[in-house]
Amino acid sequence: MYYMLIGFIIVVIAVISAGYILKRKHYQRINELEETKIKLRERPVIDELSKVKKLKLTGQTEALFESWRSSWDEIETRLFPDLEEVLLEAEMNADRYRFRSATNTENDIEQMLVVIEKQMDQILGGLKELLISEEKNAKESRMTKEKFAELRREVLTRGFKLGETLPYVEAKLNSLAENLNRYDSLTDQADHLEAREIVISVQKEMAVIEAQMERIPSLLHETDTILPEEMNKLRAGYEEMVRKGYYLAQMELDKEISRMKTQIEKMKQNVINLDLDEAEEGIEELHNEIELFYDTLEHEAEARHFVKENHSPTSDKLKRQNTVSDALAEQITEVKQTYHVAEDDLAVYLKTSAKLSEAKENFEQLTALIASGEIAYSAAQDTLKEIDAALLSISSEQDNFAEELRSLRKDELEARDDAERMRRAIITLDRKMERERLPGLPEEYLSLRAHMGESIDALEKRLEEKPLNMKAVSQDWRIAEEDLTHLTEKAEEMMENVRLVEHVIQYANRYRLRNKELADELVQAENHFYNDYQYKKALEIAVTALEKVETGAFKKVEKAYESKVSVDDIE
């Protein structure tokens, strides 16, 4: 019981201590908020309002001043009294240990102080700007009027450089003078804010006018002097080239110069209207156009040099290619008496011949136009280049065709020699098989041998045809070579199998008397070997029978065969 009482007392003391600590924290925060309120109240809003009120305000300035004073009245009559009530409520909540409510109230006070401070900042900032603007206006007004007077003097002394833009510049200056007079009137009425807006506007306008006055003389010089002179030089160069025999009608220069003159008048009017950016852009475009015309004239001069340098060489190339083409036609006639020339191959020649005729016709037309001066040298240059490219293609195609014709005789002789070589190869193969002393030849091989002979006969028969069709010869030639390769491979395989069968049976004989199954299978293998000459099948039967008795025996026999070791020496 005693310990329970002690525990209870400790809890009570802890609660009271915690409450006291929290209460002190809230009082501390409330005091801080109170200090912030006092600092806000001490700000010199009333003093600043009084200073500004003495300025005898009017217009926009007066309206702004009244709005600031109304805002201050709201702070004095409503916001501060409301703030006092909420501060009192916060203290009461803290006294009664209603800490959550106290916290919420303190947060509300902070928000109210922020609102009040923001409004006071706006009032003081506006009042300060107004007081400064009076002094600033006086200083900037003096500088602006001096700058304006300087612009006036410059227009009077250098107005001749502005040309027809002078009335427009003077009209702008007169408008600025009216704005400066209005500034003085507003300043006299103490409407300093609106007066300041006018000063700033006049300064900006004067900067624009000053920049325009710098640009106008050079732009007028472009439209009145430089561009017309450039067009006159262009026309003079054009006419000089025409007198020298250049065909330049495609340029339509008279029409283009007339159009550019209209553009110059338009650009000048833009300058007069003070649309200087548009005028500058248009002037630059005209310079670029004139430059393009000069590029065209220069290209014509270069093209004339090219035509004079390449006309005769191109004529010589045409003559040489005509000679080559005529010789090729004679060669075709001669070859056709001995060889068959395919229609596709003849079509190649006919196509190149037609292209050559077209190139010759184009060259003759070009020569006539150059002589009469009815073609631009640039167009003549393009045509010469096209003719030269066509001749290069024709020459390549006709050279290839001529080479194909020359190769016909060479291919014929090679085919005849190869037919003879293949006959000798068959005889050699037959003799080799005879030396092997085979029991006989299987039907399959005899059939291949007969077919091989027929292939060579077909090739030799084809070579006797008149006219000789070398494409058909090549096809028969290829078939005969393939048949010879196949026959040779079969013969080598057959002789290989015969030797292996003999070695396997000889090795297997060591088991023959002891193994009836092996003996029977060897008899079967020998039957295929000696009777129907199926050497591959005989080898398969003998190997299978031997492997049943001795696994891996065939590898030993095969290795001994390759090493030319006697079967009797195999262990």
Swiss-Prot record:
Residues in coiled coil: 170-215, 248-299, 326-374, 400-437, 478-529
Keyword Magnesium: no
A family per Pfam: EzrA
Location (main, coarse): membrane
Transmembrane parts of this sequence: 4-22
The keyword Cell division is assigned to this record: yes
Protein topology in the membrane: Single-pass membrane protein
UniProt KW keywords: Cell cycle, Cell division, Cell membrane, Coiled coil, Membrane, Septation, Transmembrane, Transmembrane helix
Gene Ontology cellular-component terms listed: plasma membrane; septin ring
Subcellular localization(s) per the UniProt record: Cell membrane
Cytoplasmic side, ranges: 23-571
GO biological process terms held by the UniProt record: division septum assembly; septin ring assembly
Stretches in topological domain Extracellular: 1-3
Function: Negative regulator of FtsZ ring formation; modulates the frequency and position of FtsZ ring formation. Inhibits FtsZ ring formation at polar sites. Interacts either with FtsZ or with one of its binding partners to promote depolymerization.
Family, similarity comment: Belongs to the EzrA family.
Protein name: Septation ring formation regulator EzrA
Lineage per the UniProt record: Bacteria, Bacillati, Bacillota, Bacilli, Bacillales
